[in-house]
Amino acid sequence: MASMQQTPALFRPIKVGRITLRHRVVLAPLTRFRAYASHVPGPQQASYYSQRGSVPGSLLITEATFISHDAGGYGHVPGIYTDAQIQAWKTVRVVSFVSPGLSYTCLMVCL
């Protein structure tokens, strides 16, 4: 019989590739339509991800991000295909990495 003191699996560490997560709760991609009209992520994305990545060993998967202009189809969804978009994502990453969580980008194609 399991001890009542045993940590539930959800809150136990797990190794995913080279990364060890401190728990198994992952922020799934939530496309929030908050980028600028030019599909450039703004400061609100940096704030959003740094808040949610504040617990060490957390994993965040960013909102859906267009890989090209032709792959898009929705307004205010961030892209990662122009210099301005890439620079903005770098800013988001710098702010996010001040927090101890990990993040990956969810790439999206709408055809």
Q: Where in this protein do the model-derived segments appear?
A:
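Flavin-dependent oxidoreductase catalytic cores
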Residues: 1-111
